[in-house]
Amino acid sequence: MNTKEIVNKYEFKFNKNLGQNFLIDESVLEDIIEGAEISKEDTVIEIGPGVGTLTKELLERAKEVYSIELDGDLIPILQEELKEYNNFTLIHKDALKIDFNELMENKESIKLVANLPYYVTTPIISRLLTEKCDFKSLTIMIQKEVAERINAEPNCKEYGSLTVLVQYYCNTKIIRKVSPNSFIPRPKVDSIVIKLDRLSEPRVRVKSQKLFFNVVRSSFNMRRKTLWNSLKSLNIDKESMENAFERAGIDPKRRGETLSIEEFGKLSDCIYDIL
């Protein structure tokens, strides 16, 4: 059965508070599966399985699938629809409260697949990356604007701290755009399927990741301000900051959105050296 048929079969009522939008376009489903590159060696962690349409395809291809679902009304539906699969584990919990490192412990070749409610997109991605969860890739359907921020390059309005965070840890690839007509109920925004491939090492080697991300966040907190003004929040004396900018070879009159990840790394290391 397809998604609409399962929804009708169980007379499922969508929960607006959970931002539920179920995928009904099979071509998108196929592109997610193909983009995620799932094999029998892979353990898949799925966030937001809905009624299990994508989950079935994952179960057919993966070694095992762990699906995390918050909505208690979906649990019996998923249990019934997927009862024939012995490589399926259903976790009734809020993904924001999951200990992903514990879940991934002693598992190899972990890939994440998710149709994330828009309100949890950034917190989930940030946790998976900053907590150093051991996954190979993350294939997600997210709001178009967020995907464009993740995939952005310097000198454009989409480029920001989320861009730097994700691209510090991952290569990014947009798989396809998805229209609101591909869901029930129909969302008010366009979506994008994007894949994040985890790098074996961060994109730049820095002396302090904590300082690096502090510099990045401060640089984007007030986008229209120069780096010199934005980084005053670090509470470093004027002479030391002048020295750091000079050693990094970066003009303090530039704005954060003009710096590459490599330049942020160079600047944060020069600040680290003078602290």
Swiss-Prot record:
Xref: Gene3D superfamilies: Ribosomal RNA adenine dimethylase-like, domain 2 (1.10.8.100), Vaccinia Virus protein VP39 (3.40.50.150)
Pfam families with a match to the protein in the record: RrnaAD
GO molecular function, one term: 16S rRNA (adenine(1518)-N(6)/adenine(1519)-N(6))-dimethyltransferase activity
Entry's EC annotation: 2.1.1.182
PROSITE patterns on file: RRNA_A_DIMETH (PS01131), SAM_RNA_A_N6_MT (PS51689)
Functional note: Specifically dimethylates two adjacent adenosines (A1518 and A1519) in the loop of a conserved hairpin near the 3'-end of 16S rRNA in the 30S particle. May play a critical role in biogenesis of 30S subunits.
Listed name of the protein: Ribosomal RNA small subunit methyltransferase A
Record's catalysed reaction(s): adenosine(1518)/adenosine(1519) in 16S rRNA + 4 S-adenosyl-L-methionine = N(6)-dimethyladenosine(1518)/N(6)-dimethyladenosine(1519) in 16S rRNA + 4 S-adenosyl-L-homocysteine + 4 H(+)
Intrachain disulfide bonds: none
Keyword Mitochondrion recorded: no
Family per similarity comment: Belongs to the class I-like SAM-binding methyltransferase superfamily. rRNA adenine N(6)-methyltransferase family. RsmA subfamily.
One cellular-component annotation, GO: cytosol
Keywords, alphabetical: Cytoplasm, Methyltransferase, RNA-binding, rRNA processing, S-adenosyl-L-methionine, Transferase
UniProt: S-adenosyl-L-methionine binding residues: N21, L23, G48, E69, D94, N115
Locations listed in the record: Cytoplasm
